Design a protein with these regions (language model features):
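Conserved Asp/Asn-Gly motif in the active-site loop of CheY-like receiver
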Residues: 55-59, 132
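Conserved sequence signature across two-component system core domains
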Residues: 30-31, 55, 73
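Receiver (REC) domain active-site loop signature in two-component systems and cognate sites
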Residues: 79
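Two-component/phosphorelay signaling modules centered on CheY-like receiver
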Residues: 34-53
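Active-site beta3 strand of CheY-like receiver
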Residues: 68-74
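Non-catalytic signal-transmission and effector/linker regions of two-component phosphorelay proteins
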Residues: 1-26, 131-149
């Protein structure tokens, strides 16, 4: 089932593919750039290993996470409506979501800085946009079932 929501001005707010299987890891992507969020969602889903949900309004992230129940959340650090730190704080304050790993994405960090293990508020930070298999690597390294952390 595909669920798509648009704002009153036609901007994509959320595009979700829900599947009946529990065997795939669930990744929530929160990014105000709808093209990036949708392409990341499609790329993850095309691997056959993930169910992904893209949210373009960070003010909807908590509500979406509660219904989607992600295994991992990828959050843009800088967004106009609410920044990634605010989104992370909301998720961490929710009893059902507080243990879900969060990874920040930002253009303010280089790949070298990310490899050095830079963190913001205890969360891993990766350069944005992670491309292709770099996105898969970020997801795999941060899923609770797959990471060493």
């Amino acid at each position: 089932m595909v669920k798509t929501e648009f704002s009153t001005n036609g901007e994509l707010l959320m595009n979700t593919t829900f599947e009946a299987t529990n065997s795939k890891s669930r990744v929530l992507i929160v990014d105000d750039n709808s093209r990036f969020a949708r392409s990341a969602q499609l790329f993850l889903e095309q691997t056959g290993n993930y169910v992904a949900c893209a949210v373009n309004d960070p003010r909807r992230a908590l509500e979406t996470a509660r219904s989607f129940k992600p295994d991992l959340v990828l959050v843009d650090l800088i967004m106009p409506q609410a920044d990634g730190s605010e989104v992370a704080a909301q998720l961490e304050a929710d009893w059902a979501l507080h243990s879900v790993p969060i990874v920040f994405m930002t253009v303010l960090i280089t790949a070298e800085e990310a490899r050095d293990g830079r963190r913001i508020n205890g969360h891993r930070v990766v350069p944005k946009p992670p491309r292709g298999f770099d996105l898969i690597r970020v997801v795999e390294e941060n899923l609770p079932c797959c990471s060493d952390a």
